[in-house]
A protein has these predicted regions:
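Short, well-ordered coil/turn segments that N-cap beta-strands
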Residues: 11-16, 41-44, 67-71, 110-114, ...
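Short, acidic/polar
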Residues: 25-37, 92-108, 150-158
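Solvent-exposed, non-membrane alpha-helical residues enriched in polar/charged side chains
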Residues: 35, 61, 65, 98, ...
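A short acidic, helix-capping loop that chelates divalent metal ions and anchors anionic groups
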Residues: 80-87
């Protein structure tokens, strides 16, 4: 599988990684999916301390044991579970980040993290203190690089200006083009986008009938059911016999500001289908422009 450089770092990630949030709570099934992902050539695995109270990190750690040097491992920090585990609070403080990284290392059974990401953030945060925590962890060799997982324009702008982040993880797909607003700035700063949700919750897949029906009850982002139906009909007219899943993935990867897409997978079959779709030929410039002309290009209205 082809790789791309993550920002200006020394990390090279496969164009398709595995978003591990969808692995579930069955250790056996989670391990099987991760093992299959490695066998299929994936080297990029994204988890978080928040997922299933840390259980997700434990599964990833067990599955990657003995294969650590083959893998680019990323996890996230900033959300603190309550003692009752019935909710969480936001904590971007230096003390919390430097304490919680030790817990992630323990669960992941590793002594370093390739990419440590702030899992959210607001403009009211003590941003300089947060950056200082990540920079100290880099100097200590506990993390190799750091990034943020955020959709907030004001937060992205501040970290791009004030820190050494190498990536911004955000939801991005043909139906959610809001991150494209940030392509020029992030490209100029040599900061990559990691795209989660490239298949738009299954709407941009070849088996999407049930997913589309759900939009009748509740819109998808700013798309009404009728708008979505018409947009997908136009997409299919452009791509002909090509896979919709593959087209969705190639759309995200067309601009190389995007280092990788990280769709989730809750089964081996789903993983295999995604990897197969990722092998579809690249979109031509003409196809890319045509797709852009028929899909909305909204921007984030809040947190400017």
């Amino acid at each position: 599988m082809k790789k791309r450089q993550l920002g200006n770092s020394d990390l090279f990630v496969t164009q398709m990684g595995l978003g591990c949030m969808s692995l579930g709570t069955s250790e056996t099934e989670a391990m099987r999916i991760i093992d299959e992902a490695i066998d299929l050539g994936i080297n990029f695995f994204d988890t978080a301390d928040l997922y299933d109270y840390g259980l997700n990190e434990e599964f990833v750690g067990k599955a990657l044991k003995g294969k650590r040097d083959q893998i680019v491992l990323t996890t996230k920090v900033g959300n603190r579970w309550t003692e009752e585990k019935n909710g969480w609070s936001w904590d971007p403080s230096k003390n919390y980040i430097k304490a919680e990284v030790k817990e992630s290392l323990r669960r992941l059974q590793t002594d370093y993290i390739d990419l440590y990401q702030l899992h959210g953030g607001t403009i009211e945060d003590p941003i300089d203190e947060t950056i200082e925590a990540f920079e100290e962890l880099k100097k200590e060799g506990i993390i190799r690089h750091y990034g943020i997982s955020s959709i907030r324009p004001n937060v992205i702008r501040e970290y791009a200006k004030r820190s050494n982040i190498v990536s911004v993880l955000m939801e991005y797909s043909l139906l959610n083009r809001r991150p494209e607003e940030w392509f020029p700035l992030l490209s100029e700063q040599q900061i990559s986008i990691i795209a989660r949700g490239p298949l738009a919750k299954g709407i941009l897949t070849d088996n999407n009938a049930r997913k589309i029906e759900r939009v009748k009850e509740k819109n998808y982002l700013s798309y009404s059911y009728d708008e979505l139906y018409a947009t997908l009909a136009n997409v299919k007219e452009i791509i002909g016999e090509s896979s919709l899943t593959g087209t969705a993935i190639q759309y995200c990867l067309h601009n190389e500001t995007v280092a990788a897409v990280i769709p989730g997978a809750s089964s081996i079959q789903q993983l295999q289908e995604n990897v197969q779709a990722s092998k579809q030929k690249k979109l031509t410039t003409a196809e890319y422009i045509q797709l852009q002309q028929i899909a909305k290009c909204d921007t984030y209205a809040l947190h400017r």
